[in-house]
Amino acid sequence: MEFLTNDKLTIVGAAGMIGSNMAQTAIMMHLTPNLCLYDPYAPGLEGVAEELFHCGFEGMNITFTSDIKEALTGAKYVVSSGGAARKAGMTREDLLKGNAAIAEEFGKNVKAYCPDVKHVVVIFNPADITGLITLLYSGLKPSQVTTLAALDSTRLRSELSKHFGIAPDKIENCRTYGGHGEQMAVYASTAKVDGKPLLDIIGTPALTKEQWIEIQTKVTKGGANIIALRGRSSFQSPAYVSIEMIAAAMGGKPFRWPAGTYVHSHGFDHIMMAMETEITKDGVHYKELNGTPEEEAKLKESYAHLCTLRDEVIEMGVLPAIKDWHSINPNID
């Protein structure tokens, strides 16, 4: 059995639906034989471990623990879904206060127990803010921490595929940037539909401007729609895409979608947000975005919204004033 690496991968929040799906996905993708499951809810965690044992996977060393020190010690890769789940009627931002405190503790635990970790993926919402908090308190480099942002882009591809009645693979380079929330910037200028630029189609009978606005709304409310349909928040899609991210960080195939990353350039400062990124063994790197004037204006609005959330966390006392960040994590300017 060949694996991408033999390094230890720890799944935080493994008793939950996202965490347990991440664990199974990581095994099925043959990322590493050394998988550790962590969750403070011991009975549920044991149940997940038992189910994975019952799958009969070959070559796996699956361990589980409710001791965070044991879980993180020696881990080279960590994916955390260890926050509260979003429920009906809630926005991602409604989760801010409780999950901000969880992110602070998580970051400090990473620093204490696995300072040599290679990459951390944070996916509990609001992921842009929980990822930022984790980065600050972990002491890691910005290139070592990413957040889940890709679902908005995959949802855009799905909506366009349904609208045009063609296979998703014929919809190329769908992108949303900025925040992973309803204030995200949905880009049309990057995408192609069966080889034709989406911008050339919008405003024609094939896709009227009104229909495009409706699609954008469906994308921004995609997570809420899953809750309405299933009675619970998404778990299959975030689990799969997050493991794709950590696989890329292990040296696997390139990650195809935007990721949330720490940004301190191009007019966006001291924030974690979705950018055009590349995730490799060397970490995550992003490049400047070029969109239409309308798209760039929307991106600035999304950034401003994230700054408001960040400043709320500063007011809560979970994050210190920005001027003090470098003293906590010298890797952050």
For the regions a language model picked out, list residue spans one by one.
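Conserved N-terminal Rossmann-fold NAD(P) cofactor-binding segment
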Residues: N6, L31-A75, A84, D311, ...
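Conserved glycine-rich cofactor-binding loop
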Residues: A15
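N-terminal Rossmann-fold NAD(P) dinucleotide-binding loop
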Residues: G19-S20
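Generic hydrophobic/aromatic pocket-lining and core-packing "Φ" positions
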Residues: A23-Q24, G107
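Conserved S-adenosyl-L-methionine
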Residues: M28-N34, G139-P142
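Rossmann-like NAD(P)-binding element
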Residues: C55-H119
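Rossmann-like NAD(P)(H) cofactor-binding subdomain of soluble oxidoreductases
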Residues: T91-E159
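C-terminal substrate-binding/catalytic lobe of Rossmann-fold NAD(P)-dependent dehydrogenases
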Residues: S138-S143, S153-D333
